[in-house]
């Protein structure tokens, strides 16, 4: 595979105990390897933006994370605040319970609130949390994300057990077609797995093992 995997990696550190020193190291690694972005919790966006101010590496953060169980208004506020602090990509979690309740109108409105808050200022990736969904629910979630104007659909938070699978990535790609990107996250710890996800249709990889992936090693625990 000749694709530049580094340019597809969101170099991720979302552990609650992450320190400022570790966030700075994450940014240094992203600069060194030319990753697409660093993905950090909202409290670290300013730090990451400062560290990456003179680079092409984008700052990504998470919204309604990891449960997705906040209101559309709260997610919109989080998005605005993150953008003010320097985020250029936001990964939001859908209202999973609403999806499972069949309340597609709320799911779409929830996504749209973030899309509108980010409009013209940040990419929006929609985490559907595949480990908690049936295939039918995965398809519906992806359709709603596209309908609401999201830029990407994303498999997982990394906090709900299972992560990305080739099967889920392929299903998501078939569902969105060329209308959105697909981000595989959770459990991608080596180059072989990353390449399998890309072959299945992923256009972005979320991982805390970015350095291991580009250097042919195997990374440790997720996020």
Swiss-Prot record:
It comes from the Bacteria. It catalyses: 2-deoxy-D-ribose 5-phosphate = D-glyceraldehyde 3-phosphate + acetaldehyde. One of its GO terms (biological process) is 2-deoxyribose 1-phosphate catabolic process. It is an enzyme of class 4 (lyase). InterPro entries: Aldolase_TIM (IPR013785), DeoC (IPR011343), DeoC/FbaB/LacD_aldolase (IPR002915), DeoC_typeI (IPR028581). Its EC number is 4.1.2.4. Keywords: Cytoplasm, Lyase, Schiff base. GO terms for molecular function: deoxyribose-phosphate aldolase activity. It is found in: Cytoplasm. The active site is at 91 (proton donor/acceptor), 154 (schiff-base intermediate with acetaldehyde), 183 (proton donor/acceptor). Pathway: Carbohydrate degradation; 2-deoxy-D-ribose 1-phosphate degradation; D-glyceraldehyde 3-phosphate and acetaldehyde from 2-deoxy-alpha-D-ribose 1-phosphate: step 2/2. SMART domains: DeoC (SM01133). SUPFAM superfamilies: Aldolase (SSF51569). CDD domains: DeoC (cd00959). One of its GO terms (cellular component) is cytoplasm. NCBIfam families: deoC (TIGR00126). Catalyzes a reversible aldol reaction between acetaldehyde and D-glyceraldehyde 3-phosphate to generate 2-deoxy-D-ribose 5-phosphate. HAMAP family: DeoC_type1. Belongs to the DeoC/FbaB aldolase family. DeoC type 1 subfamily. This is Deoxyribose-phosphate aldolase. The gene is deoC.
């Amino acid at each position: 595979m000749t694709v530049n995997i580094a340019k597809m990696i969101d170099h991720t550190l979302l552990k609650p105990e992450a320190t400022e020193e570790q966030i700075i190291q994450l940014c240094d690694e992203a600069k060194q390897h030319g990753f697409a972005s660093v993905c950090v919790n909202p409290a670290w966006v300013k730090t990451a933006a400062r560290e990456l101010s003179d680079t092409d590496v984008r700052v990504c953060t998470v919204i309604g994370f990891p449960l997705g169980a906040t209101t559309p208004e709260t997610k919109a506020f989080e998005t605005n605040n993150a953008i003010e602090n320097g985020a250029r990509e936001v990964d939001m979690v859908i209202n999973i319970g609403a999806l499972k309740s069949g309340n597609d109108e709320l799911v779409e409105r929830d996504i749209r609130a973030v899309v509108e808050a980010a409009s013209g200022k940040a990419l929006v990736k929609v985490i559907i949390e595949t480990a908690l969904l049936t295939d039918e629910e995965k398809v519906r979630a992806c359709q709603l994300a596209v309908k609401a104007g999201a830029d990407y659909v994303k498999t997982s938070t990394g906090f709900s057990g299972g992560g990305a699978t080739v099967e889920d990535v392929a299903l998501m790609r078939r569902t969105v077609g060329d209308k959105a990107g697909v981000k595989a996250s959770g459990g991608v710890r080596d180059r072989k797995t990353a390449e399998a996800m890309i072959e299945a249709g992923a256009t972005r990889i979320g991982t805390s093992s970015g350095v291991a992936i580009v250097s042919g090693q195997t990374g440790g625990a997720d996020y």
